Amino acid sequence: DLSKSLNFLARTEIRKSQRVKQLSKGMKTQLHLAIVMGINARMLVLDEPTLGLDIIYRTEFYDQLMNEYFDHQRSILITTHQIEEIEHILTYIMIIDKGKIVINMTIDDIGIHFTQLKTAKESAEQARKLNPVFEKDLLDQAVMIFEDIDVERLKEFGEVSTPHLAELFVAAIKGTHHG
């Protein structure tokens, strides 16, 4: 759909009179994304689509992608290292490390299976006995991620929450880590 591509291009600094070879790397990425917006496919695969763009254009692209492209009849597969930027639009996540799938579940299942605990250093040793899958020190606290644990057991040690995907990504790739 040419109109969607032109609509996206209108929000950039690219002018119709410019030649591609005159464009900066970021502008070339914007041009590619404008072309993507015009594709009418049931499955759209994007590999690091916003690489080289500043945060404003990245945010605008993902907002426009969700508002104008996604209609519940299409699927979008995005590979990215910028998880925190797309976390709010994801329905499913797969984390792959060296060719091996380490997490493969819906976003809703993340909250069911993983719990993050922020605890004072004095309570960390007791919490550690519950076998976190990941741990890091943060100022005067220990931050731990647990898998498939009764949340009530953790509440006595500190603040519990669902980990953000970036934290879960680090936990899945690094595994248990102290320090």
Question: Where are these predicted regions, by residue range?
Answer:
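Generic alpha-helical secondary structure signal
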Residues: 3-7, 59, 108, 122-125, ...
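Short, well-ordered coil/turn elements that cap or connect secondary structure elements
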Residues: 2, 71, 129, 154-155
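C-terminal coupling/interaction segments
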Residues: 132-134, 138-179
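ABC transporter nucleotide-binding domains
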Residues: 1-84, 88-91, 97
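ABC transporter nucleotide-binding domain
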Residues: 62-146
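Short, surface-exposed beta-strand/loop "edge" segments at domain boundaries and coil↔beta transitions
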Residues: 44-49, 123-127, 150-155, 167
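Conserved protein kinase catalytic domain
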Residues: 9, 62, 111, 169-170
